[in-house]
Amino acid sequence: MNYLDLILQQQQDKIAIITDDNQYTYGELAQKAKNIRQTIDLTAKRRPIFIHEDKIIDQLISFLAYSGTNHIPIIATDASKNQEFIIKDIPENACMGVMTSGSTGKSKLFWRNYNSWADFFPIQNKIFNINEDTVIFCQGSLAFTGNLNIYLGVFACGGTVIATEKFRPKNWLDLMTKYKVNTIYLIPTKLLLLPKFATLPNTQIKQIISGSQSMNKHDALKLKQIYPKTTITLYYGASELNYITYINDIDMTEDRTSVGKPFTDVKITIKNEEIFVNTPYHVEGISLPFSLKDKGYIDTNGSLHFLGRKDDICNINGLKISTSKIENALIKVFQTNELIVIPSHKNDSDTLKAFIAGEKQFTKQEILKSLKPYLTDFEMPKQFIYLKTLPKNESGKIDKLKLQSLM
């Protein structure tokens, strides 16, 4: 079984995907992939194929064309395009390569077998309320593993994807109305742009799926003002492990560290504040339980709390500081996820700089006063830098490397 076969199993005259330029039935999608497959040397030595297409539909068709052949498709991230990967052996069971987002400048490459995703589709689709009637809106490249996984999960049950490359929230709302979208998949920073542009509530949206960033009850209420009939599901996951935990809006509180309870078959343990995960749906070649080097704890209700990555701890003039803690405090002050804290070393001194999207709202003194209930003096950023927008990678995460080049 492979992903092209998965497409061929669906109702062939049903619309599979609508993009900025065109629409394709399942049959048309399969035929385009078959046309490319006819040009592939299926007798050649097994090797990885890095897909560098810019358009979502070209990424998808190329991926499907190579799926199930002796060539292993990898939809490449922008960060990886200048990287050299030394690939000695591809695991025998591997059907695809997946990459991490590369928010620090480099992407990591992992191998997946078909069942590590396909066997989980029924579980995730049940939690996300995805079925053959789903019409889901997604934005951005399939190099973001979250997008590719959601697409394939929707295709596995015969749903329809509405896809756009454009970063235009007003246009997103128009597309949702035009194509009668009932499900949205976007990361929180993109989701929370929608209330700024929506003029009327949309009762057609029944499900919102989000992840890769934090969200709390306050954020959920903003979204429910424009999508009153929706259920919001936030997940915690990783390229290496698939989905780990999830939480619905009804269970969210003001505590944005809570990421909910484990998916079926996923087990979590905590050792010295480090999160370890045991799951059958992991990439090839890792040992279990696996650590993402994330910090957290499990509360009395069995919910996991994500406290940031271990490498978010930086040394500022001899003191260990958590940039995640500072960012969460800044989110409370600025009421936006569009910010990041980065340590800087200059003139033999370490300082913290906060980058914030948008125009200056407060004086530095006002910000520091607002932060006092949450941070100690040595945790306070020394500089607040305002940019119209913060640079992002394919996953929608803030690109730290590009910001560091501005420092």
Describe the role of every protein-language-model region.
Residues 13-43, 81, 88, 112-115:
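Conserved AMP-binding/adenylate-forming core of the ANL superfamily
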Residues 29-34, 109-131, 139:
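Conserved structural elements of the adenylate-forming
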Residues 51, 293-379:
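AMP-binding/adenylate-forming catalytic core of the ANL superfamily
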Residues 73, 95-122:
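Conserved AMP-binding A3 loop
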Residues 119-135, 143-183:
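Conserved AMP-binding/adenylation subdomain of ANL enzymes
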Residues 183, 195-253:
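Gly/Ser/Thr-rich phosphate-binding loop
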Residues 221, 226-231, 240-303, 311-313:
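Conserved AMP-binding/adenylate-forming
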Residues 375-397:
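AMP-binding/adenylate-forming catalytic domain of the ANL superfamily
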